[in-house]
Curated annotation (Swiss-Prot):
Sequence positions that bind (2S)-2-hydroxy-3-oxobutyl phosphate: S86, T87, R128
Name used for this protein in its record: 6,7-dimethyl-8-ribityllumazine synthase
Organism of this sequence: Trichlorobacter lovleyi (strain ATCC BAA-1151 / DSM 17278 / SZ)
Gene of this entry: ribH
PANTHER family: 6,7-DIMETHYL-8-RIBITYLLUMAZINE SYNTHASE, 6,7-DIMETHYL-8-RIBITYLLUMAZINE SYNTHASE DMRL SYNTHASE LUMAZINE SYNTHASE
GO biological process: riboflavin biosynthetic process
């Protein structure tokens, strides 16, 4: 019978860095509220949560890399909102942010949770920031907690 390794959802004693974009702040602030809510509900102490506000989504990977390199955190949660406009800017930013965040996780060996919305409309972003479609910031924080614990169980 195989041995299964699963992470639990206990954030007690863990430290978290959160990188959040100021651009589209009316969305990103809801994502941040959701992430902090999830961490605290699962046992994290608010004093073990550090939030770095950055200008936009494109800057998320560098800020996440800097947080990961500081070795102060068990996981980093990335939050932002890229909403499609009438130019190709959406494709460039959303692609680079997702690749950059994945790269930081692989290079650092630290769980980096992706809570960056990439939506076609503002309405879709609002739905994913705490209304009809849940709160993706909350979900990213839960992912971070579980991933930290499963990685610890593997070692």
């Amino acid at each position: 019978m195989p041995k299964f390794i699963e992470g639990n959802l206990d954030a007690k004693g863990l430290t978290f860095g959160i990188v959040v974009s100021r651009f589209n702040s009316f969305i990103c602030e809801r994502l941040l509220e959701g992430a902090i809510d999830a961490l605290v509900r699962h046992g994290a102490n608010e004093t073990d949560i550090t939030v770095a506000r950055i200008p936009g989504a494109f800057e998320i990977p560098l800020a996440a890399k800097t947080m990961a390199a500081s070795q102060k955190f068990d996981a980093v949660i990335c939050l932002g909102a890229v909403i499609r406009g009438s130019t190709p800017h959406f494709e460039y930013v959303s692609s680079e942010v997702s690749k950059g965040v994945a790269s930081v996780s692989l290079e650092s060996g630290l769980p980096i949770a992706f809570g960056v919305l990439t939506t076609d409309t503002i309405e879709q972003a609002v739905e994913r920031a705490g209304t009809k479609a849940g709160n993706k910031g909350f979900e990213a924080a839960v992912t971070a907690i579980e991933t930290v614990n499963v990685i610890k169980a593997m070692k």
